[in-house]
Regions:
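Active-site mouth of glycoside hydrolases
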Residues: 1-227, 231-234
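Mature N-terminal, pre-catalytic/accessory segment of carbohydrate-active enzymes
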Residues: 1-13, 22, 412-442
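Flexible, charged surface loops at secondary-structure boundaries
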Residues: 21, 229-232, 253, 338-341, ...
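Hydrophobic anchor at the start of a short beta-strand
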Residues: 100, 258, 368
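Extracellular glycoside hydrolase catalytic/binding regions
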Residues: 164-167, 176-308
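Aromatic- and carboxylate-lined catalytic core of secreted/periplasmic carbohydrate-active enzymes
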Residues: 267-383, 391-420
């Protein structure tokens, strides 16, 4: 995606190399339902021109021309180049130990971006959508209310569109379903509740036929709020600002993992401080990285700090038995603590200085290790005994992270660095979370 039409090549290998260098292990692989993005709808983050998105899942064969002057889509004919690139990119990420959340549909455009935002003309996403009646040769018309602004294709109101969507979903599963580093995302910030569940079931049905299973998630700021997303079939969810998950995210205690994404909080935003708060509150922090600033925002020094914090948090996560850990705000005086009581504690000190850890009723000897949240530097701390409140002081100024681990017995095995081998796996167990980085739209 870029301002050229057709878009220029995106150096995906270089991008993955940046993620790998930073120690990141996750991307959202964006879909874009329309053929354009008018990022003026993104306000200050946007660009003063229209972006073009290609390839699309369907061939443009005509007969006849679409609203953009190009051949109309034939929604009965999949585009082999689209699915070949999808598989290639997922495979390349897997070789680098990176999970890929394959986005099936994109909803921000029609649900938010096309509704008179910024200086972008209303309805731009719908007029460049393949399911617009003037853009395909199959007679599919997703605009049930006739406003020519927001097609109702992310609902069950258009059976002809749903039939095309089901065939596309099956093709995606057939394309990447054998790869172990795959997750699915129903739609970015969109989709009616019954349609979201229909998409999940369509994926599940195809996976049952193929005897495979991958996690499927729902993301916030669409037609559903968090309570709705949790009351359904999704394996993971991504809360948003409207549900109270912003600068100071509350602790996560749900069975389904939380992939807390800056996209659904600020768009491009966040800070190193937010990364560590989210991590010690039990979330998987994701960063919508503007990367080179081609689509949104610009390269900034503050984003380098976010990337660094993500990598250092992920490095610490790899040393822990996260499946056994849960957020326990009350065990640290700062209110940020991830713990397996009696075995391991990770506390974050946003203001640095001193933290008091509650080891009352806990026996054993613990050793402390300090981690600098921006550099990843590790400094050995004191050894303390359980059984009381214990105070620790950071050996450097500014924010700090401390790891307290039991220094004897079999529990020590939980703190041994684990070197991943082969394709990465996504663990669903409560409390298990991976610190990750989110792909740019490209």
């Amino acid at each position: 995606m870029d301002r050229r039409d057709p878009p220029g090549a995106f150096d995906f290998s270089r991008y993955l190399g940046m993620l790998q260098k930073q120690g990141h292990n996750f991307i959202r692989l964006w879909a874009w339902d329309s053929t354009t993005l008018d990022s003026r709808a993104n306000g200050a983050l946007g660009k003063p021109f229209v972006h073009h998105a290609a390839p699309q899942p369907w061939l443009r064969t005509g007969p006849g021309l679409a609203l953009d002057g190009k051949p109309k889509f034939d929604l009965s004919k999949h585009n082999p180049a689209y699915f070949a690139r999808l598989r290639s990119r997922v495979q390349e990420a897997g070789k680098r130990g990176i999970y890929v959340s394959v986005m099936l549909f994109e909803g921000w455009g029609m649900m938010h971006g096309g509704r008179e935002r910024g200086s972008a003309p209303p309805g731009w996403p719908w007029r460049s959508h393949p399911f617009h009646k003037d853009n395909n040769v199959n007679g599919v018309n997703g605009d049930t209310d006739g406003d020519d602004r927001t097609g109702e294709v992310h609902s069950l109101a258009v059976p002809a569109a749903n039939k095309v969507q089901a065939a596309y979903i099956r093709r995606v599963v057939d394309t990447v379903g054998d790869l172990k580093n795959v997750l699915y995302e129903v739609i970015n910030e969109g989709g009616r509740r019954d349609w979201n569940r229909w998409v999940i079931e369509t994926v599940r049905e195809r996976e049952r036929q193929r005897r495979v299973r991958h996690p499927i998630g729902l993301t916030g700021h669409g037609a559903e709020r968090l309570a709705d997303m949790l009351d359904g079939a999704a394996d993971w969810v991504s809360p948003g600002r409207l549900d109270g998950y912003g600068d100071d995210p509350p602790a996560w205690s749900r069975e389904r993992p939380s992939l807390l994404d800056t996209d659904h909080i600020w768009g491009v935003g966040g800070s190193a401080d937010w990364v560590w708060k989210a991590f010690t509150r039990g979330h998987n922090p994701l960063f919508m990285d503007p990367y080179e600033g081609v689509v949104l925002d610009e390269p900034r020094e503050r984003w380098e700090q976010v990337r660094a914090a993500m990598g250092h948090a992920r490095a610490l996560a790899d040393r822990l038995d996260l499946a056994a850990m849960t957020p326990r705000n009350g065990l640290a005086s700062t209110g940020y603590c991830l713990a397996e009581p009696g075995v391991a504690y990770v506390a974050y000190l946003p203001a640095g200085g001193q933290v008091v850890l509650n080891l009352v009723g806990i026996s054993g000897t613990f050793r402390a290790e300090w981690v600098h949240p921006l550099t990843g530097a590790r400094i050995a701390g004191p050894t303390v005994e359980g059984g009381a409140q214990r105070s620790l002081t950071a050996p450097f100024g500014g924010p700090a992270v401390v790891l307290m681990s039991l220094s004897r017995g079999t529990a020590q095995a939980a703190l041994t660095p684990q070197r991943p081998s082969g394709a990465p796996r996504f663990a669903k167990a409560r409390g298990r979370h991976e610190v990750a980085s989110l792909s740019v739209r490209g």
